[in-house]
Amino acid sequence: MGRIIGIDLGTTNSCVAVLDGDKARVLENAEGDRTTPSIIAYTADETLVGQSAKRQAVTNPTNTVFAIKRLIGRRFKDDEVQRDVDIMPFKIISADNGDAWVEAQGRKMAPPQISAEILKKMKKTAEDFLGEEVTEAVITVPAYFNDSQRQATKDAGRIAGLEVKRIINEPTAAALAYGIDKKQGDNIVAVYDLGGGTFDISIIEIDSVDGEQTFEVLATNGDTHLGGEDFDNRMIKYLADEFKKEQGLDLRNDPLAMQRLKEAAEKAKIELSSTTQTEVNLPYITADATGPKHLVVKITRAKLESLVEDLIKRSLEPLKVALADADLSVSDINEVILVGGQTRMPKVREEVSAFFGKELRQDVNPDEAVAIGAAVQAGVLSGDVKDVLLLDVTPLSLGIETMGSVMTKLIEKNTTIPTKASQTFSTADDNQSAVTIHVLQGERKQSSGNKSLGQFNLEGIEAAPRGMPQIEVAFDIDADGILHVSATDKKTGKAQNITIKASSGLSDEEVEAMVRDAEAHADEDAKFEELVQARNQADGMVHGTKKQIEEAGEALPADEKEKIEAAMANVETAVKGNDKEAIEKSTQELMEASAKLMEIAQAKAQAQQGQPEGEAKAAKQDDDVVDAEFEEVKDDKK
C-alpha cells in the first residue's frame, strides 16, 4: 500500500505534508518553498501553477486564476460569488447548471478542475520526496464548508488522480498538529482559523486516557467568505480611491493596473504586521494624454486597521455562537490556537486575545499546522499512528422540506460524525402516489433560507387518505461529512436512496471526462518538459561550440569550421520548432561534426597544463610571495 499524504488546499497558499517516521513533515516544492501559491495561469501553450503563475500575473491578469476555493461548490447567483464577479480580474461565468465557473483562454472550467491543478502540484511534490507514486490523500476543508463544497473538493482530488481517503476540517487538523505530541490530560482548545478566503472557529476537547488521545469537536462555526482576500480588497479599494482623488483616473477599468495594485496591497498589508508605516510606490501605473502617472501612497498600520475593523469584528460573532453551542464560557477554554496567514496581523491577535481573555499559543505555525494535521490523520487511516481517535462534527443542520415550506431537521448541527438519523413522514394529499424528498442544509425554519442539497422522488405509494402512508426518511453522514439519504414506504417496502450530490455540482460523467483530460494533459506536460530539456541541451551545445571555435582560432582548418557552422545552423533552426527528435538529431550531428574541434581543444588544454605550474615555481624561487596575493594581481599591473 502506498503512502497517504496530507494536503492543505488553501485559498491563498497550499501545503503538503507526509508522515516521516513518527513525525509529520512539511515538504518543499520544486522551487524550494514549503507553501505553494494557490494560483493557476493559463497561457496559449501551457498551464502554470504556483510561483510561476504568480510571477506572470501582472502581464496576464484575465487568465490568471486565484482564490478559486471561494467559488468551489457555489452557485453563480450566490451573493458571495456576485461580490467576487465585480472585483476579480478573471471572468466568472454561470455554467449550464447554474454553478459558478471560470473562463480563461476561451476555455470554460469548473472550480474543481482548476483546484485539481494545485492538487497535482502537491502530489508531484510528495512523489519527488518519497520517490514513489502517490494515489491517496487526506484533504482539508474549512469546517463550515457545506455538502456541495465538500463534494466539489473530493471531485478535485479525483481529477488530480488522487483517491481522497478523508476530508478533514481545517481547525480539527490544526488541533491534531498541536496536540499530537502533548500527552497532558483534558484540554479544551479554541482554534481560530482565518485564512486567505475562509474563516472557522472550532472548540475541541483533547482527552488523554490510558495512552489514547481523543480529539472531540464540541462545536464549530464560521464564514466561508471571510479571509485575507477581503482584507486585501479593502486595501486595494483604498489605494484606487486615493489615486482617483489625486489623479482623476479610475484604475478599476484597467486589469493590468489592478493586478499590480493587488500585489502591492498584499505586500503592504504583510509589511504592516511588522512595521507601523509603509509606502506603496507604483511608477507608471497608468497614463493619460498628459503622460504617465505614478501611484505613491503612504499607509499606516492604524489606517489599515480602520479599513478592516468590521471584518475583524465579523469574525468574533461566530466565536460567541460556537461557545454557546458547546455550552461553554470563555473561561472554560484552556488554549487558543491561531491558524491561517491572516492571523499574523497584530490587530487580529489583539482582538482574539481580548475576546478569550488569555495569551495566544505562539508554538503553532499558522501556515503549516493544517497540512501537518492532515498528515497525522493520514497516518491514523494507514495505521501508522495509533491511539488517536478523532471525533468531528457536521457544521450545519440537515433536514427535509415539509408542508408549508418548513425545514424539518433530522440531524442537528455539531452532531458528531459519522451519524445516522431517521424520521417517519406521510403524504399531504389523498391518494398521493409519489413524494418528493427535498434535502436541505442550514439553520433557518423557512426552506428557502437554507441551502438546497438536492431532491429525489419516491414513487409507487399505494392510494390512501392523506396522512396514512408511512414514509421513513433516513439520513446517514459519513466520516467526510457527506450525506447519504434514503426514503422507504414502510407498507410496500419500496425504497429510493441517493448519495446527495449538490443540486448543481459535477456529474460522475463530467468528473470522469475531466480526469481523462487531466491525464491527457499530464502526457502533454511530460512531452513539453522533454522538449524544453532537448532545447536547453541544444542551446548549451551551440554556445559551447561557438566558444571553442573562438579559442581554437587558426588551429581549426577552414573546411572543418564550415562543417561545424552548418551543423550549428541546423541546430538553431531545429530549436525554433517543436520536434524533439529533430532537435536531438541535429544536436548529435553537431557533436559529431565538432570531433576535430574537440581534439584541438584537448591538445591545447594539455599543452597549457604544465605552464602555470612552471610559472608558479619560478615565482616561488624569485620572491616569497603568498599564493593568494599572487592570484590577486591584475594582468595590466604585472
From Swiss-Prot:
Ranges of biased composition (kind: Low complexity): 601-613
UniProt KW Oxidoreductase keyword: no
Region (Disordered): 601-638
Keyword Iron carried by entry: no
Induction (free text): By stress conditions e.g. heat shock.
Keywords, ordered alphabetically: ATP-binding, Chaperone, Nucleotide-binding, Phosphoprotein, Stress response
Protein name, entry field: Chaperone protein DnaK
Organism of origin: Shewanella pealeana (strain ATCC 700345 / ANG-SQ1)
Gene that this polypeptide is encoded by: dnaK
